[in-house]
């Protein structure tokens, strides 16, 4: 297990494993509005997956691991998409700012993320340690299959 980082594992498997860790640990509380919210104005429906909040939190944590100093505005760009306008041309639309802000705040409550003095948020040493440990577990599980 030692010596493996988040960069060494498949990103989809890692995000699923980290989301399962968040859900199983019980420290990450899912807000009440999670089942009724859309993830951006370009979306027509709310997400179908009931655990989407854990998956989004894991995805944001992985993104902060890869490049720190990312704030709410950058997260809305990352999770944006194509807005369909009927017969008119489609355009890019940003993701929900509220969802991005609440995800970052919940990661701060877990002490995995802290505010960067240069702007945005960055991963703490505790967060990096936990994510590297989970990456090592993902490597062990992927070698068994």
From Swiss-Prot:
GO CC, one annotated term: cytosolic small ribosomal subunit
SUPFAM superfamilies tied to this protein: Winged helix' DNA-binding domain (SSF46785)
GO biological process, one term: translation
Position of the signal peptide: none
Chain segments annotated as coiled-coil in the UniProt record: none
Subcellular location: Cytoplasm; Nucleus
PROSITE patterns with a match to the protein in the record: RIBOSOMAL_S19E
A Pfam short name: Ribosomal_S19e
Origin: domain of life: Eukaryota
InterPro entries per the UniProt record, alphabetical: Ribosomal_eS19, Ribosomal_eS19_CS, WH-like_DNA-bd_sf, WH_DNA-bd_sf
Swiss-Prot/TrEMBL keywords: Cytoplasm, Nucleus, Ribonucleoprotein, Ribosomal protein
GO molecular function annotation: RNA binding; structural constituent of ribosome
PANTHER family attached to this UniProt entry: 40S RIBOSOMAL PROTEIN S19
Function recorded in the entry: Component of the small ribosomal subunit. The ribosome is a large ribonucleoprotein complex responsible for the synthesis of proteins in the cell. Required for pre-rRNA processing and maturation of 40S ribosomal subunits.
UniProt family annotation: Belongs to the eukaryotic ribosomal protein eS19 family.
Complex formation: Component of the small ribosomal subunit.
Protein name (database record): Small ribosomal subunit protein eS19
Species whose genome carries this gene: Myxine glutinosa (Atlantic hagfish)
Upper classification of the organism: Eukaryota, Metazoa, Chordata, Craniata, Vertebrata
């Amino acid at each position: 297990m030692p010596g493996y980082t988040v960069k060494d594992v498949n990103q989809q498997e890692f995000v699923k494993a980290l989301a399962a860790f968040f859900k199983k640990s019980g420290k990450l509380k899912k807000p009440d509005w999670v089942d009724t919210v859309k993830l951006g104005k370009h979306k027509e429906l709310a997400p179908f997956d009931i655990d989407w909040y854990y998956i989004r939190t894991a995805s944001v944590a992985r993104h902060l691991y890869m490049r720190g100093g990312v704030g709410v505005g950058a997260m809305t760009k990352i999770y944006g998409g194509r807005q369909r306008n009927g017969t008119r041309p489609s355009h890019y639309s940003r993701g929900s700012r509220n969802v991005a802000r609440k995800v970052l705040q919940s990661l701060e409550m877990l002490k995995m993320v802290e505010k960067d003095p240069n702007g945005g948020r960055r991963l703490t040493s505790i967060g990096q340690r936990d994510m590297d440990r989970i990456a090592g577990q993902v490597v062990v599980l992927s070698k068994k299959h």
